[in-house]
């Protein structure tokens, strides 16, 4: 993998946040199926993520044969991320990190939120340890080109809980594996980007 530019990092993390922050609408799904993201998928393939891109594209292709496919994907999203902790893979660090690590973890996270003057959307009460908060912090760190903190966030604050989160994601039974493929891509991108 070639090192990402600042703009590429920002785009990738915005895309991942959009993919994992809420279910795709019918119009968003149609955009993927019509090929509007083919250039982005080609970029990811060139970066060495061919298997993951093919998996995502295969799921999108299969959904073309499903009536009301966006509702099927919404059901998968709900099953994966929104039910209780025994049924779903909740996208929160506090679910996967040991209790002893939480204070230090949240102190680091809160310092970054303050640094970038990020406030959580009070209309939708989300805890600060939601996966999309981390993705936004990565985007912000890429924007200011603070690669030391960027790598620290990935290695010390994100991957330690993202790996067990992915284990749970892969065990949840859904009709498609679309979101499972996206989570694997996220982890591989983080691991590869941290090594460059």
Curated annotation (Swiss-Prot):
Question: The organism's lineage?
Answer: Bacteria, Pseudomonadati, Pseudomonadota, Gammaproteobacteria, Pasteurellales
- Know the name of this protein? Chaperone protein TorD
UniProt entry keywords in alphabetical sequence: Chaperone, Cytoplasm
Q: Which GO terms describe its cellular component?
A: cytoplasm
* Organism of derivation: Pasteurella multocida (strain Pm70)
* S-S bridge residues: none
SUPFAM superfamilies tied to this protein: TorD-like
What subcellular locations does the record give? Cytoplasm
The superkingdom of the source organism is Bacteria
Query: What does this gene product do?
Result: Involved in the biogenesis of TorA. Acts on TorA before the insertion of the molybdenum cofactor and, as a result, probably favors a conformation of the apoenzyme that is competent for acquiring the cofactor.
Q: Which gene encodes it?
A: torD
Please give the family membership noted in the entry.
Belongs to the TorD/DmsD family. TorD subfamily.
For the biological process aspect of GO, one term held by this record is: protein folding
